[in-house]
Amino acid sequence: MARTKQTARKSTGAKVPRKHIGSKQAHKQTPVSSSSGGVKKVHRFRPGTVALREIRKYQKSTDLLIRKLPFQRLVREIAQEFKTDLRFQSAAIGALQEASEAYLVGLFEDTNLCAIHAKRVTIMPKDIHLARRIRGERS
């Protein structure tokens, strides 16, 4: 199929009323060709735009990033290996979650710095290893 130039169309700004079709069967029988302009193209943002928006959103917020119940299940599962039938106060699990999220955010910040130092924008496992090694957590 040959390429053709598309001309800009002016928008009226008002919503066009839809044609009411009696049943789903009638809708399936009427083919809509893509060349007639009946099918609307799905809007997609450029790569990285949504990521930057999410970064700004999470930097503004102070709420917890991990959902509470999955974190609670993880804590109970890990504690089960040391002693069975342990009970936790909700404040204790909240404190564990605050501390672990603060640790992970700090680790990812250091990991990002390691990736930037290597002239990359993508973090890799070796960046995490280097960040932990510099911190003195792992030799």
UniProtKB/Swiss-Prot annotation:
Stored Pfam families: Histone
Sites bearing N6,N6-dimethyllysine, chain numbering: 5, 10, 28, 40, 83
Coiled-coil annotated spans: none
SMART domains in UniProt: H3 (SM00428)
Principal place of residence: nucleus
Identification of the protein by name: Histone H3.3 type a
Record family assignment: Belongs to the histone H3 family.
Modified residues (N6,N6,N6-trimethyllysine): 5, 10, 28, 40, 83
Biological process, per Gene Ontology: chromatin remodeling; epigenetic regulation of gene expression; response to mercury ion
Domain of life: Eukaryota
GO molecular function list: DNA binding; protein heterodimerization activity; structural constituent of chromatin
Extent of Basic residues compositional bias: 16-27
Changes after translation: Acetylation is generally linked to gene activation. Different methylation states of H3K4 mark distinct developmental phases. H3K4me2 is associated with euchromatic regions. H3K4me3 is a mark of active chromatin. set1 is responsible for all mono-, di- and tri-methylation of H3K4. H3K4me facilitates subsequent acetylation of H3 and H4. Methylation at H3K9 and H3K27 are linked to gene repression.
Stretches the record annotates as Disordered: 1-43
Function: Core component of nucleosome. Nucleosomes wrap and compact DNA into chromatin, limiting DNA accessibility to the cellular machineries which require DNA as a template. Histones thereby play a central role in transcription regulation, DNA repair, DNA replication and chromosomal stability. DNA accessibility is regulated via a complex set of post-translational modifications of histones, also called histone code, and nucleosome remodeling.
Family matches, as InterPro entries: Histone-fold (IPR009072), Histone_H2A/H2B/H3 (IPR007125), Histone_H3/CENP-A (IPR000164)
Keyword annotations of the record: Acetylation, Chromosome, DNA-binding, Methylation, Nucleosome core, Nucleus, Phosphoprotein
Residues annotated with N6-methyllysine modification: 5, 10, 19, 24, 28, 40, 83
N6-acetyllysine modifications at: 5, 10, 15, 19, 24, 28, 40, 60
Post-translational modification Phosphoserine, affected residues: 11
Subunit structure: The nucleosome is a histone octamer containing two molecules each of H2A, H2B, H3 and H4 assembled in one H3-H4 heterotetramer and two H2A-H2B heterodimers. The octamer wraps approximately 147 bp of DNA.
Subcellular location: Nucleus; Chromosome
CDD domains noted in UniProt: HFD_H3 (cd22911)
Keyword DNA-binding included in the entry's annotation: yes
Gene Ontology cellular-component annotations: nucleolar chromatin; nucleosome; nucleus
Organism of this sequence: Dictyostelium discoideum
